[in-house]
């Protein structure tokens, strides 16, 4: 079924193709990239970093190719430039990837049960170890997930053999464009047993979360001690610190009916590292407006162009770097994964409604009930549930900007993509007809270092 439908809206509410070459981010990279690469050539700059920057300069530029959308009713056409599909800092591609991930998890993965966000941050030394030794990320993540499950078992009074369901997002950045690796886990607020019965969680106190934080701290420090990253005395000092730098938060709970809130939460967890709308010029520098004040109380960052490129380069993930992980019943090898996904977005049925969870004033008064969800899962035809969902470009645009891109702005009829143009002569011919630039924006060549200024006279005149 086509995602474009006839709508009764004013003609002004239409999709307008973006113009990346007009943004401050594009212009900065366009003018400074070659000079920056020339200076950084003396360093060990990863190849994938340069590739990411060069791909970004091709993203959204019509001269590199495009798709053609056509309205058969009135003959109106418009062009959609190809994207770079970068995984680094490209705001457009990462925004679409964020929307696709959130839509997929909300519509096709998470059942309609309460969902809680767990956020784990580390002290600077541990962050340094994780950033420079990616092989350590998965073991530390495993410690984190086991601690969450231990909390869910204790609060729900379920068996330790039951399984949780979670998706963890690895965020490598902070709000100030700084390296700050931390975990965001979107966790089903309960446990599943072997047949698919669900045990919801009752009251979760701050004391329980703090005890889980101390357990994570102890096990993570022990892990790095065994791996030789820490000396015994250093590890003991980290365990005795009053302000350890470890932080565990589980205060955000999304109710079962709030699917819009769930999608908003997942978008936050999968958000891009950079927002181009916050970048402005400030004389010979750049001003990046922060989403919230940093530790110094600053609301803006004043950066030189090279400083911006340095920060972006550090935040580009290496190839084949996983951005999110599935755990428990949502893991790829879980025998319950198909059943849980079949229940995505469905209302769970209570076999015995009189045994609903009793929420007490503290964690000791919480009693759990078993909610058989397997009967609901069996009622869903799994053959009709696609194994892989691909959200098209038009659907993502509509979901992000609430604008239907394949609706004709002239007659409000449906438009269709009729061709993908990659041939250079054809590209130039079409762009000429539309009075669009046939050549991509020129990339400034590398500049030499500035001439040094001396205060003393360097003339060849001598006194007799």
List the predicted regions and their residue ranges.
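Beta->alpha loop/short-helix hinge microenvironment recognizer with preference
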Residues: 1-464
